[in-house]
């Protein structure tokens, strides 16, 4: 198995940390994959999952680049620097780096949660040219997402302390739509909170420049409606329902697998279908 190569890339003023998994037995015209990771605790929760997926893809002849957005993970910068416009540019920087390392490849972006949202935003600006987007439960409603993060944050506090601090739940009930300054150990900058508040399904229009596959659960009516609206605009998008045993924000436990095999198989298959 090829050892992934860790490195920094991008402009000197905004370096990004990446891990490149070179393809074994690569052939001209092969697919290469850019992993667009989730935000905060969701990114930490899926770190090992995407590591295993990247290793599997490399063995199958698919070069893969994993990276941390500026101000997150092992990339330079502070959490307070995190915001969607900068991360969108980071994604295109990562795309250009993968193009440099796999020059003859068809590049597919695999974006999970807020990483999927950023993939939509980056792909439509014309600066980078993915052949395909695979969006795994993308965040299409920023306020709904922020409320979920707050609820999970309060639930984590409840399970951490012997005597739960009821002030957190009272605040959640009193201001259900408020944007959190912190969620599950990760700060949300003022700019990011403003951007999430403005994030709606209507603000995430797809383009016809690439194919898009959306993977989500069968009970996610909002994402299904968004995909249907994109199809009504004759965008090349397809919705596929997919259930898995990975809880985005919790530690692994019997009902939340760390690296569910069905999810690995589904995402690997999604590159070519």
Task: Annotate each PLM feature.
Residues 121-125:
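Active-site signature of alpha/beta-hydrolase-fold catalytic machinery across serine-
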């Amino acid at each position: 198995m090829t050892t992934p190569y860790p490195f920094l890339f991008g402009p000197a003023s905004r370096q990004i940390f990446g891990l490149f998994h070179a393809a074994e037995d690569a052939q001209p015209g092969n697919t290469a994959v850019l992993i667009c990771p989730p935000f905060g605790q969701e990114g930490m929760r899926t770190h090992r999952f995407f590591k295993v997926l990247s290793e599997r893809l490399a063995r199958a002849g698919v070069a893969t680049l994993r990276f941390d957005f500026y101000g997150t993970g092992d990339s330079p910068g502070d959490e307070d620097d995190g915001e969607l416009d900068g991360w969108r540019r980071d994604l295109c920087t990562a795309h250009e780096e993968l193009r440099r390392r796999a020059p003859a490849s068809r590049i597919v972006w695999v974006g999970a949660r807020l990483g999927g949202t950023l993939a939509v935003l980056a792909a439509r600006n014309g600066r980078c040219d993915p052949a395909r987007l695979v969006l795994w439960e993308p965040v299409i409603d920023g306020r709904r997402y922020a409320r979920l993060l707050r609820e999970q944050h309060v639930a984590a506090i409840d399970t951490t302390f012997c005597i739960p601090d009821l002030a957190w739940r009272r605040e959640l009930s009193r201001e259900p739509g408020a944007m959190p300054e912190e969620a599950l150990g990760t700060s949300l900058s003022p700019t990011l909170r403003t951007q999430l508040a403005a994030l709606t399904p209507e603000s995430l229009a797809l383009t016809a420049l690439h194919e898009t596959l959306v993977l989500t659960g069968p009970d996610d009516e909002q994402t299904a409606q968004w995909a249907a609206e994109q199809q009504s605009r004759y965008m090349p998008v397809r919705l596929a329902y997919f259930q898995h045993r990975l809880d985005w924000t919790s530690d692994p436990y019997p009902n939340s697998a760390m690296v569910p095999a069905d999810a690995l198989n589904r995402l690997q298959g999604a590159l070519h279908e």
